[in-house]
């Protein structure tokens, strides 16, 4: 009997030790996630406050709004849930309802800001002239206000009026709801109506809009890349055909295959860029919103096909919040923000780089497909050399359009096509006064 008691005590101690180790690992992982989210989004906000040129671009207003929503996720949502995960119960009592409202509001605001960014970039690429006229700071603030207002309406009003909770079906469940849900944990059961309606507004409708906009952006970029490739091949072909042999006879000339390979490479890079944007977002949030719509339909029978354990649900909740730590890397890691981050962190002085040539592809704020290549010698500040191919009918941003050096740079290729401009210097803008609207066939109107 004494041996049996000793074995039982040893088994209990082993389980407790494993549970303690698991809690420590969980605490470390969640702390790193919260700190990375705080650091990334704080850097974005600090860069915008510190550098005036970042505030001058209307598109960055949406990036700032996204960073604020993600920062609120890291401050108002993540820490409280992390403490509950480590402690094994909800220790904050009646703060539960307010926390649930903050959770829904901040997460919805983050997703809606991502949707607004996708619409903004599509509009800038598809209708650049109209975008320059219509997308003023006032228009940007209106879009941002709509996103935040919708987030508040879908969160605080239903939660404070208890519209979001599922009604208890029996006395025992009612007691558990009134006691356990408030004191022991904060995993409130959503009603079916609220779960579906909030999921539609917070995720399914925005993700559908993002899929449509980014698909169209890729198609526009693909057409422009192929048009540019055709112009490059025509230029090389014409140059080769003008070369003569020693006796004055023209040499045989052929279309270069390298241009086709470069075109395919550029299309692949654009596709990868857009795939990362959508892939990260969908992978982080889709599992949670699927479960969010399934759990309210969890029955009381033996099979319970829509029921899952709380640990699985919490894991996918954290997957969704993790998207807030990745957004600064995806949306605020262009050349402007990278230089601002390097200045804020002192990396120009403390982080010397080796010789390295890096080529990246992106779609900039002006609606252009950008193939950037920068050479970074050791111990010096990196100098970007970007080749920007403007989408047909697209022009540069109106901010700072006073420099005219780009006109001289673009002249050689303007002879090939008035729809094409090449900018070799990142800091050089294209003057709207020097570029006339073009028709569908690529000619200036007469």
Swiss-Prot record:
GO terms for biological process: adenylate cyclase-activating adrenergic receptor signaling pathway; G protein-coupled dopamine receptor signaling pathway; positive regulation of MAPK cascade; vasodilation. The gene is DRD1. The keyword Transmembrane applies. The chain crosses the membrane at residues 24-49, 61-87, 97-119, 139-163, 193-218, 273-299, 313-337. Disulfide bonds join 96-186. SMART domains: 7TM_GPCR_Srsx. GO terms for molecular function: dopamine neurotransmitter receptor activity, coupled via Gs; G protein-coupled receptor activity. This is D(1A) dopamine receptor. The keyword Disulfide bond applies. PANTHER family: ADRENERGIC RECEPTOR-RELATED G-PROTEIN COUPLED RECEPTOR, D(1A) DOPAMINE RECEPTOR. Belongs to the G-protein coupled receptor 1 family. PROSITE patterns: G_PROTEIN_RECEP_F1_1, G_PROTEIN_RECEP_F1_2. It is a multi-pass membrane protein. It is found in: Cell membrane; Endoplasmic reticulum membrane; Cell projection, Cilium membrane; Cell projection, Dendrite. Keywords: Cell membrane, Cell projection, Disulfide bond, Endoplasmic reticulum, G-protein coupled receptor, Glycoprotein, Lipoprotein, Membrane, Palmitate, Receptor, Synapse, Transducer, Transmembrane, Transmembrane helix. Residues 1-23, 88-96, 164-192, 300-312 are extracellular. It comes from Bos taurus. Gene3D superfamilies: Rhodopsin 7-helix transmembrane proteins. Residues 50-60, 120-138, 219-272, 338-446 are cytoplasmic. Glycans are attached at residues 5, 175. It comes from the Eukaryota. Pfam families: 7tm_1 (PF00001). Dopamine receptor whose activity is mediated by G proteins which activate adenylyl cyclase.
């Amino acid at each position: 009997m004494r041996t049996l008691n000793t074995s039982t005590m040893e088994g209990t101690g082993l389980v407790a030790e494993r549970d303690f180790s698991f809690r420590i690992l969980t605490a470390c992982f969640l702390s790193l996630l919260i700190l990375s989210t705080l650091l990334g989004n704080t850097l974005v906000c600090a860069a915008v406050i510190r550098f005036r040129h970042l505030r001058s671009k209307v598109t960055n207003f949406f990036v700032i709004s996204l960073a604020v929503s993600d920062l609120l996720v890291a401050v108002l949502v993540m820490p409280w849930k992390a403490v509950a995960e480590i402690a094994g119960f909800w220790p904050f009592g009646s703060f539960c309802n307010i926390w649930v409202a903050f959770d829904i509001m901040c997460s919805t605001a983050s997703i809606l800001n991502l949707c607004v960014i996708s619409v903004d970039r599509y509009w800038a690429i598809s209708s650049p002239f109209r975008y320059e006229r219509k997308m003023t700071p006032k228009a940007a603030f209106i879009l941002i206000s709509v996103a935040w207002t919708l987030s508040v309406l879908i969160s605080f009003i239903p939660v404070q009026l208890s519209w979001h909770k599922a009604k208890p079906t029996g006395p025992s469940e009612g007691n558990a709801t009134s006691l356990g849900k408030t004191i022991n944990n904060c995993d409130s059961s959503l009603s079916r109506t609220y779960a579906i309606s909030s999921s539609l507004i917070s995720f399914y409708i925005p993700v559908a809009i993002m899929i449509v906009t980014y698909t169209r952006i890729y198609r526009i970029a693909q057409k422009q890349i192929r048009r540019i490739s055709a112009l490059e091949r025509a230029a090389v072909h014409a140059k080769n055909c003008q070369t003569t042999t020693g006796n004055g006879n023209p040499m045989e000339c052929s279309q270069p295959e390298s241009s086709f390979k470069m075109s395919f490479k550029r299309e692949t890079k654009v596709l990868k860029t857009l795939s990362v944007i959508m892939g990260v977002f969908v992978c982080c949030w889709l599992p949670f919103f699927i479960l969010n719509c399934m759990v309210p339909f969890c029955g009381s029978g033996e099979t319970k096909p829509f029921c899952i354990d709380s640990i699985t649900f919490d894991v996918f909740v954290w997957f969704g919040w993790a998207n807030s730590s990745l957004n600064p890397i995806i949306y605020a890691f262009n050349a402007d923000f990278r230089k601002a981050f390097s200045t804020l962190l002192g990396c120009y002085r403390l982080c010397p780089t080796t010789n390295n040539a890096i080529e990246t592809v992106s779609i900039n704020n002006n609606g252009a497909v950008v193939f950037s290549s920068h050479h970074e010698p050791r111990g010096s500040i990196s100098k970007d050399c970007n080749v920007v191919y403007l989408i047909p009918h697209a022009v540069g941003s109106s901010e700072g359009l006073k420099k005219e050096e780009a006109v001289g740079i673009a002249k050689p290729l303007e002879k090939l096509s008035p729809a094409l401009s090449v900018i070799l210097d990142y800091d050089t803008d294209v003057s709207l006064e020097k570029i006339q609207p073009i028709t569908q066939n690529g000619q200036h109107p007469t």
